[in-house]
Amino acid sequence: MANTLFKKTPLLAALASALIFLAAHDSRRFANLSQSADLQEEKWVDSVFAALSEEERLGQLFMLRAHSDMDSTYHKMVEDLILKYKPGGLCVFNPSYLGTPEKHAELSNRYQAASPRVPLLIAMDFENGVGMRYKGNAISFPRAMMLGAIQDNRLLYEMGREVARECRRMGVHVNFAPVADVNNNAQNPVIGERSYGEDRHNVAAKAYQYMAGLQDGGVLACAKHFPGHGDTDQDSHDTLPAIPYRRERLDSLELFPFKMLTENGVGSVMTAHLWVPSLDKRVNWPTSLSESAIQNTLRKDLNFEGLVFTDAMEMKGVPLVFAPGEADVLALQAGNDVVLLPRNMDEAMGAVKSALQKGTLDRAKLWQSVKRILRAKYRLGLNAPQRVELANLSRDLNTPEALALKHRIVSNALALVRDEKNLIGFPNLENLKFATLAIGDTNRTVFQTYCGNYAPMAHFNTPKEVGDSLETKLLDTLRKFDIVLVGLYGIRTTPKPAKSVNPVPGVDTIYGLTHSELDFLRKLNQQHTIALTVFGNPYTYGWMDAPPLLLQAFTEDPMAQQLAAQSLFGANDLNGIMPVTAAPWACFGQGMKKIFPQKRLGYALPESVGMSTDSLALMDGIVSEMVGTGAAPGCQILVAKDNKIVWQKSYGHFTYEQAQA
C-alpha cells in the first residue's frame, strides 16, 4: 500500500515549520553520509579505505563495550580487543558511577593510541548530559519528560550545544540521543521519563532542538529507538516487546518524530529490538534485524542517508535462538552500518567473515557502510590524531555558565497543574500559618529549607511507611496550620522496581509509592488545605486525589527543590505544562502560566543575572584577610540583582570573643 503520509506536501511542510523553531546554525553536516561533502573528504575516505585490509574494514562495522569504572586488567582487555579487531569505535559505560571524567579521558587517550591509523568513534548515552553517566562529577540536566514541559524550545537547543561542548572536551564524538520515542504508555518500564512525552509534535520539536544543538556543537546525534519504543509495557533489555499496530498508526504517531529528525539532518538512527508486524511479517523478528524496516521504511520512506546503529546486541530483545555470531550477520544484512556491543566479538567477526566468503553478506553494501563510518569520522575531525587534555577537565565541564543554563531550564519546566483556591504566591502570607511536610524523606529537605526563607515554618517529615500512630499524630498536629506545603519524595522513574530492588509485598506500589503514603496523602488532602509539590514522575497522579494546588517539579534535584519553593512564594514565574496525561484532572498541555508582577526576592546563580561567580568569589579572600587581621570579627554578605539573591555568605563570628559564629 502506498505510504501517503510521507509524500512531500505543502501541508507537511507547513506542519514541519510550525513544529520546529529552526536553529540559526547548520546542523545538517551529518545528514548525508552516503556521499562525500567535498573533494578533500573524498580523498581522505578513499585513501583510508584503500589502506585497510578486508578484516580491518570489517572491524569498522563494530562498536565495542568499554567501562571507565573497572580495574587495569579490564582496561588491558579492551586495549587488546582494539589491537586485535581494529573496531570502529567504543561505547563507554560507568554503571557503578565510580568512574570519573578524568579516568574516561585518560582511557580515551590510551585507546586512541591503540588505533593510530583510524581514530575510534567514542560514544556514550548522554541523554540528559554528561552527569547521566558521571553522576556527581558532571552536570545532569533534566530528563526528557521534564524537558517536555518547557514551552521555549530554544532552551533545548542551548542544552544540546552545552552537552556537545562537554562531550568534545572529554573526547566523546557520538551522543546516543535524542530519545524520539512517544511515551503514551504509563506502564512503559524502560522509556518513561526518557521521552519528551505523549504528544508527537512536542516530542518531534524537542528532539529536533536537542539534536540540532548537539550537531552544531560538533557531536553526532542519534535518534532512538526506531521505529518507536513508547507504547509497550515491556523492556527490550529483557525480552522482545511487540508494537502491534497498523502502518497507518505508526506513520501518524511512532514514526512521526523520526521523520521530522531525518528530514532535518539527524546524523544517525538507532534501530530497536522490537517486533513490529506491520514492518516485517516474520513472527518475533526484531526491527533491528529487519531489512524491510531498515531498507524500506528508514532508508527509502524516510529518505535517511546517515549512519544506522543497532541497539546493543547484548540485549535479550535479540532472540537467543540465533547461533553465535548469527545475529550480527543478520544485523548487517538488514542494513545497519554499525553493530553495537556484540555479545562476543570473536564469534561475531568469525561469523561475518564466513558470511562474506559464502556470499551471504554483500561485500559492496558492507563497504558502503564502512565509507559512511569514515565520512562521519572525517566530519567529526577524526582525520587527525585524538588526544584529550587532562588538565582542568572537571573545571571545564562544570562551568558556572552551564549551571546557569540548567537553572533556566529547570525554572521553565516547573508546571502549575492546579490552583483551585488561587493560593500560588501567598500574597498575604503574614496572615497565614505554614507547615512543611516531606513525605518519603525523613531528613530536612532543600525544599523545606527554602520555604522557610519566606515565612515562619514548622517542618515535619515522614518515612515511606507512615504507620497508624504517626499518621494520627500528624493529621491532628497539622490542624493548627492554614497551609501545609507537602513535598512528595522517593518516586521511581519507572513503574516497576529495578532488578536490584526487593519490593515489599502489599507495600510497594507503582513508581515506588507505598499504600501507606498514598492513604496518608488522601486523608491529608481531605482534612487540610495542602499545596502539593511532586518531586518525581507525574504518572503517580493516577493513584491520588486532586489537591487544591499542585506543582509538578519532576525531580528531587536540589535546584528543582529551590525553584519550587521560590515559585510557591511568588519569586519565580511558572510556564511549564504537563508533558503527559497522568490523571483525568491532569492532562497533556495542562499548566497555568503564572507571571508574578511584584516578585519576592528569589535565588539564582550570578551568571543568571549577568554577573560572574569567579568575580564574586574574590570577596572570600578580602573578607578572610579582614577577619584574619582583626579588622572585624566577621560579617555577612548578600548580593542581589534583578530581584535575585546571587551571593549570601557568613564569615567569622559576631564578636571578637568568638562565642557565636
Question: What label would you give each PLM region?
Answer:
Residues Q60-R65, G88-F93, L120-M124, N128-V130, ...:
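Structural recognition of the beta-strand scaffold that forms the well-ordered cores
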Residues S608-A661:
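Short, conserved catalytic-motif segment at the N-terminal edge
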Residues M1-S36:
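Bacterial Sec-dependent N-terminal signal peptides
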Residues H67-M70, S96-G99, E127-G131, A180-N184, ...:
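Solvent-exposed loop/turn segments at secondary-structure junctions
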Residues H25-L83, K300, F322-S608, S612:
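Preference for extracellular/luminal or secreted protein segments
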Residues G59, D80-T100, A186-Q187, T262-W285, ...:
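Short acidic, glycine-rich surface-loop motifs adjacent to enzyme active sites
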Residues A149-V172, V179-S195, R200, A207, ...:
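A substrate-binding/cap region within the structured catalytic cores of diverse enzymes
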Residues S53, Y74-M77, G99-P116, L120, ...:
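Second-shell residues forming the walls of enzyme active-site clefts
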